[in-house]
Regions:
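Short glycine-enriched, charge-decorated loop/helix-capping segments at active-site entrances
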Residues: 55, 99-102, 147
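A short, conserved alpha-helix in the catalytic core of glycosyltransferases
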Residues: 38-39, 44-50, 55-82
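Extended, non-globular alpha-helical segments
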Residues: 21-42, 94-133, 158
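A structural signal for well-ordered alpha-helical scaffolds and beta->alpha junctions
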Residues: 3, 15-16, 108, 112, ...
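Acidic/His-rich active-site region of diverse nucleotide-sugar glycosyltransferases
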Residues: 1-51
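Short glycine/serine- and small hydrophobic-enriched flexible loop segments
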Residues: 68-71, 117-120, 143
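Non-catalytic, C-terminal membrane-associated alpha-helical segments of glycosyltransferases
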Residues: 121-174
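Active-site donor/metal-binding and catalytic loop motifs
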Residues: 79-99
Length: 174
């Protein structure tokens, strides 16, 4: 069983993604996005911003909604005292003495496809796109080089990239 680890709240400023520290901040922080399963969203906010995109299927659903809400002038806040137990990823892979979170090749398809779909949106801030894209390239490059089955990861990542460019949504093709 993996060790319990706190995921930080993050905020992109300029070309930096900063992990926000609850121990040195107030109890509530303005953030880029939150995990959807841990969100409390008033119904009137859903009416104003719209629902979360079901066509994304999985991955970036919450990020897209939070960025859209922020674009429309509604800040997104993380509450430092809130706790959500949530397992992310599959079994970690060890590399150079450290453990790294992994996902299946299928999950990487959605991650890349939905990221590319989000980068195509004109209302997503350019600095956020640049920071996210650079992190995505590093993360997916790592999985292609280190996480077995490497060729399946490469194929699904490439397919996700192409489908994102083509604007395809919904469930992944088999």
């Amino acid at each position: 069983r993996r060790a319990q680890k706190k995921s930080p709240f993050v905020r992109t400023t300029g070309l930096r993604r900063t992990r926000l520290d609850c121990s040195t901040s107030g109890p509530v922080l303005e953030v880029d996005h939150l995990i959807a399963s841990g969100c409390l969203i008033p119904m009137d906010m859903l009416a104003r911003v719209g629902r979360m995109r079901e066509d994304f299927f999985i991955d970036f659903v919450d990020v897209e909604w939070c960025l859209r809400a922020r674009f429309e002038g509604h800040p997104v806040y993380g509450v430092c005292t809130a706790r959500l137990e949530h397992r992310l990823g599959d079994e970690p892979v060890k590399f150079l003495g450290r453990e790294y979170l992994t996902h299946s090749p299928r999950r990487h398809y959605f991650h890349v496809r939905n990221a590319v779909l989000l980068y195509r949106e004109p209302w997503v801030p350019l600095n956020w796109k640049l920071v996210s894209a650079s992190r995505l390239v590093l993360k997916m490059g790592f999985h292609v080089l280190v996480t077995p089955p490497r060729l399946q990861h490469l194929a699904r990542i490439a397919s996700g990239f192409l489908h994102g460019l083509l604007g395809r949504t919904g469930a992944a093709p088999d």
